[in-house]
Amino acid sequence: MAFYSYNSFLAIFWTRLPGHSVHPPCSHFPPLAFFHLPDSHLRTAYMKNCGSRKYSYPGLTGNNKVHPLRTRLPQKLHTTCWLQNHPGKPQPEQIPEEPKATDPQPTKDDQTEVAEGKWSLRQKIIDEVKYYYNGFSLLWIDTKVAARIVWRLLHGQVLTRRERRRLLRTCADVFRLVPFVVFIIVPFMEFLIPVFLKLFPDMLPSTFESESKKEEKQKKMMGAKLEIAKFLQETMTEMAKRNRAKLDDDSSDSSQLSSYVKQVQTGHKPSTKEIVRFSKLFEDQLALEHLRRPQLVALCKLLELQAFGTNNLLRFQLLMTLRSIKADDEVIAKEGVKALSVSELQAACRARGMRSLGLTEEQLRQQLTEWLDLHLKENVPPSLLLLSRTFYLIDVKPKPIELPPSIETPKTNLGIPSSPPPESKEDITDPAPQLNGTKILQAKSQETSQNSKANSKGA
């Protein structure tokens, strides 16, 4: 009885343990488990088996024999290892996973654009502080330089054109700061300075203006000047028609004037002699006293002046500006055009209603020298000179960059028969079709000759 209870307890104990299943020694075999089941007499136990190997428990050796009966129970093994591919059995098809669509990574340019677009309030404040600090520092430097120029002027020294213009610019910048004194004197009014600057940005000195803003302003003024130039060209053609009608049709002056106007309209660049010759016909009509309001307004815009007020005020404004231009021309002629820098050349051409953008340095010097020759040497009226510059304002274009001619290396003929050079590159054709055509013509000529011989023999 004790033996029976011992064997039954031992069998139940081994079947209830977590190690009741044994992993196969090779991954090619299916996961099977063999359990020990007691026989009818409860004297022997069946052993676990995997394949052909047998495992016996300690204590079950001796005279106890093992029956060949085994109970085979399939059971899935919980393991983290993959089964190896068996060479004899077909493997289940594995569906490849589709690659997941990954979002494109933002480039550095996109990151910089996002960073620039999302400026914080602190960065904006820092940029504004730097902007005003640089403007005031440049204004302080210009003020010190202007003080030295004034000291030299008081001691009787003669100033150059560049020094005089710098002194005038600095004085204008200092006087622009006078209205801001009111904001400082009145308490708590300094908080309105940003609003005032937003409404009137031109009240700041020239040292606060950046290069990009200057270029944008010049481009806008250039577009307005082109429109004004077209209007002034129409006025010139109308005046030419009137003068041609007044003159006799048979006279040489009328025919030459008509041809001159046609050449100018087609883009011909008139010479100084032609301008001087035909300027005598327009002296009375192009005087400031005889110009109408649309023409006066157009000339004021051409010289970048304010076009507000009565006709007499516009004439007086134009007269004073033309006098200052003549004095400046005399100084430039005395110092020489070559002494001017590129920025000074552009400013001088812009003040005289000529093109200043899109030209080379040589073209700027050339048109300025032509202006000086006509204004100082030939004594052309300034109003006519301004109207004549409108044709240059549209027609003048920058010169293309000339490339140096390519150096061709001499070619040597290595035993190849030289062929006659073609007349032009466009006349080069393939000789194969021509040869085929000649062969066909030769064959046809032979056939016709044979037919003619046969006919003659038959006759």
Swiss-Prot record:
Predominant location: mitochondrion
Keyword Membrane recorded: yes
Compositional bias (Polar residues): 435-459
Membrane topology: Single-pass membrane protein
Mitochondrial intermembrane side, ranges: 26-176
Disordered: region residues: 88-114, 403-459
Signal sequence, renumbered to the chain: none
GO cellular component terms, A-Z: mitochondrial inner membrane; mitochondrion
Tissue: Testis and sperm.
Protein name: LETM1 domain-containing protein LETM2, mitochondrial
Species, as recorded: Rattus norvegicus (Rat)
Gene name in the database record: Letm2
